[in-house]
C-alpha cells in the first residue's frame, strides 16, 4: 500500500471518508489535496461519529500523520473547531498543514452568499462557505497563504492588498455588502483563531518525501466526485477545484506522485446535493432518502435520489483512472421493490454531454432482482443474498474495473473485501 488515492466516482457523498477510515489503519500519512469546508466526510469508528470537513479521515489512526495539502482552501475557525472536536473525543492529533494552502476567509463566505442571492433562480447551489471566491482570489494572485500566518507583517500587507482590490468590486456589485473589518482587525482575528494549529504549518513536501523514501504507506483523500470536477464535471454546477486522482500529487505537495492504487468510491444508487442534472432521478424520493439518511453533511440539504447510473459512474471511473471500486451503502437497497440500473442514455448528445444537453437525456434501464434480507451482518461476499451478489457483479461488468470492497453499513467492520 505505498500510495493509494481515494476519489469519488459520482457527485460526492459516495462514502469516501468511510473508505479512507478503513484503509487508514495501515497508513503512515493521510492527505487531503483539494477543497475545503464545503463538503463533509462521515466517519464512524470507536471514537464516535464525525463529519469531517477539512481534516483527513485518517486523523483517527495514532500512527498516521494528517496532512492538509497546498491544493486546499482552509477555513481557519472551522479547522480550529474540527481539531477541538476530535481532541475532545480522545484523538491524538498529528498534523502537517501546508504553508502554500490558501485561507478561506469570512469575507469569502460573505461574497459567496451575496453572489448566490444575486443569481436567484440561476444560483449554482453553493454551500456558501466561500470556496469559489477563495480559489478565485488565489488565481488572481490576491489570495492569503497559510504560511503568512507565521509572518504577521506580510499577512497584514497582503490582506490590505486584497481589500484594496476586492472591496470596491463587492460594494459595486452588491449594494447590501456591509463588510467593514479593517486589515488590522482581520489580521488580529486570524492570529487569534489559528492559534490551535499554527505550530503545524510547514512545507509538507519534505515530510511526505521522507516517508516516500521509507516506502511508507501514503493515503490520499479527495473531496466530492468526478461529476463535480471543475474541468470534467457538469460545468457550471461544479466545485472550484480539481477532484480527480491526477491532481493528487499536485494538491498534496508531491507533484511526481505515481499512485499504485486508485480507489473510486461509488454509491450503490445515485444521489446528488446542489444544482445540476440527475438523469436517473426517482419519481418518489422521500421515503428512500429518509431510510438511507441522504442529507448534505455541510448544509443538511436533502439529496436528490436516483437509481444507479452506470453511464455517469463509468465516466467517473475512467476520469479517475481507477484501478478498483469500493461500492457503498448497498445495505440501503434491501427491501427496495423496484431495483434497476441505468445502462445507457437515450436522446441527442448521449455521448459525453455537457450542460444543458444533460437535461434532455432519459435513462435506459435494466431491471434487477431485488432482495429483502437485512445484509448489515454479512462479512463475506458469498454470504450476501444471490440477488445482491448479482447486483454487484452486474455493476462490476458495466464498469470494467473490479469491485474490491462492498460496504454493508457505516461501521468499520461492516466491510466486505473481495
Curated annotation (Swiss-Prot):
UniProt-listed Gene3D superfamilies: Adenylosuccinate Synthetase, subunit A, domain 1, Adenylosuccinate Synthetase, subunit A, domain 2, Adenylosuccinate Synthetase, subunit A, domain 3
Catalysis performed (reactions): IMP + L-aspartate + GTP = N(6)-(1,2-dicarboxyethyl)-AMP + GDP + phosphate + 2 H(+)
Keyword Secreted in record: no
Keyword GTP-binding: yes
Family: Belongs to the adenylosuccinate synthetase family.
Taxonomic lineage from the root: Bacteria, Pseudomonadati, Pseudomonadota, Gammaproteobacteria, Alteromonadales
Pfam families: Adenylsucc_synt
UniProt GO MF annotations: adenylosuccinate synthase activity; GTP binding; magnesium ion binding
This enzyme's EC code(s): 6.3.4.4
Enzyme class: ligase
Gene designation: purA2
Top-rank taxon: Bacteria
Keywords, in A-Z order: Cytoplasm, GTP-binding, Ligase, Magnesium, Metal-binding, Nucleotide-binding, Purine biosynthesis
Gene Ontology BP terms: 'de novo' AMP biosynthetic process; IMP metabolic process
Role: Plays an important role in the de novo pathway of purine nucleotide biosynthesis. Catalyzes the first committed step in the biosynthesis of AMP from IMP.
Self-association and partners: Homodimer.
Cellular localisation: Cytoplasm
Residues annotated as the enzyme's active site: 13, 41
Cofactor details (free text): Binds 1 Mg(2+) ion per subunit.
Pathway in which this enzyme or protein is active: Purine metabolism; AMP biosynthesis via de novo pathway; AMP from IMP: step 1/2
Name this polypeptide is given: Adenylosuccinate synthetase 2
Annotated GO CC locations: cytoplasm
Residue numbers binding GTP: 12-18, 40-42, 303, 329-331, 407-409
Sites where the protein binds IMP: 13-16, 38-41, 127, 141, 239, 301
Positions annotated to bind substrate: 297-303
Main subcellular localisation: cytoplasm
Amino acid at each position: 500500500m505505498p500510495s493509494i488515492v481515494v476519489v469519488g466516482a459520482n457527485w460526492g457523498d459516495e462514502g469516501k471518508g468511510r473508505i479512507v477510515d478503513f484503509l487508514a489503519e495501515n497508513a503512515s500519512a493521510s492527505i487531503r489535496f483539494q477543497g475545503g469546508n464545503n463538503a463533509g466526510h462521515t466517519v464512524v469508528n470507536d471514537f464516535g461519529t464525525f463529519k469531517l470537513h477539512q481534516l483527513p479521515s485518517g486523523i483517527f489512526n495514532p500512527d498516521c500523520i494528517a496532512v492538509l495539502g497546498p491544493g486546499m482552501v482552509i477555513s481557519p475557525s472551522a479547522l480550529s473547531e474540527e481539531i477541538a472536536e476530535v481532541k475532545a473525543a480522545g484523538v491524538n492529533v498529528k498534523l502537517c498543514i501546508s504553508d502554500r494552502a490558501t485561507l478561506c476567509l469570512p469575507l469569502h463566505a460573505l461574497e459567496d452568499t451575496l453572489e448566490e442571492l444575486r443569481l436567484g433562480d440561476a444560483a449554482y447551489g453553493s454551500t456558501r462557505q466561500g470556496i469559489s471566491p477563495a480559489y478565485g482570489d488565489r488565481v488572481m494572485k490576491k489570495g492569503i497563504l497559510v504560511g503568512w500566518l507565521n509572518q504577521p507583517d506580510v499577512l497584514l500587507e497582503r490582506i490590505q492588498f486584497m481589500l484594496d482590490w476586492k472591496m470596491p468590486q463587492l460594494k459595486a456589485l452588491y449594494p447590501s455588502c456591509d463588510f467593514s473589518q479593517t486589515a488590522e482587525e482581520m489580521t488580529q482575528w486570524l492570529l487569534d483563531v489559528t492559534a490551535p494549529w499554527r505550530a503545524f504549518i510547514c512545507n509538507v513536501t519534505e515530510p511526505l518525501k521522507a516517508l516516500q523514501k521509507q516506502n511508507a504507506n501514503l493515503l490520499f483523500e479527495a473531496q466530492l466526485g468526478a461529476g463535480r470536477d471543475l474541468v470534467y464535471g457538469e460545468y457550471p454546477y461544479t466545485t472550484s477545484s480539481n477532484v480527480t486522482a491526477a491532481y493528487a500529487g499536485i494538491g498534496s505537495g508531491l507533484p511526481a506522485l505515481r499512485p499504485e492504487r486508485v480507489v473510486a468510491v461509488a454509491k450503490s444508487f445515485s444521489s446528488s446535493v446542489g444544482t445540476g442534472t440527475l438523469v436517473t432521478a426517482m419519481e418518489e424520493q422521500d421515503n428512500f432518502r429518509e431510510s438511507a439518511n441522504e442529507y448534505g453533511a455541510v448544509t443538511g440539504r436533502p439529496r436528490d435520489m436516483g437509481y444507479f447510473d452506470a453511464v455517469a459512474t463509468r465516466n467517473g471511473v475512467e476520469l479517475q483512472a481507477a484501478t478498483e471500486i469500493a461500492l457503498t451503502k448497498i445495505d440501503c437497497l434491501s427491501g427496495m421493490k423496484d431495483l434497476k440500473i441505468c445502462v445507457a442514455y437515450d436522446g441527442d448528445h448521449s455521448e459525453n454531454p455537457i450542460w444543458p444537453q444533460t437535461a434532455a437525456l432519459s435513462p435506459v434501464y435494466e431491471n434487477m432482482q431485488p432482495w429483502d434480507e437485512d445484509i448489515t451482518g454479512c462479512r463475506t461476499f458469498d454470504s450476501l443474498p444471490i440477488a445482491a451478489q448479482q447486483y454487484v457483479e452486474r455493476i462490476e461488468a458495466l464498469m470494467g474495473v473490479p469491485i474490491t470492497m462492498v460496504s454493508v453499513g457505516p461501521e468499520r467492520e461492516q466491510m466486505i473485501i473481495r
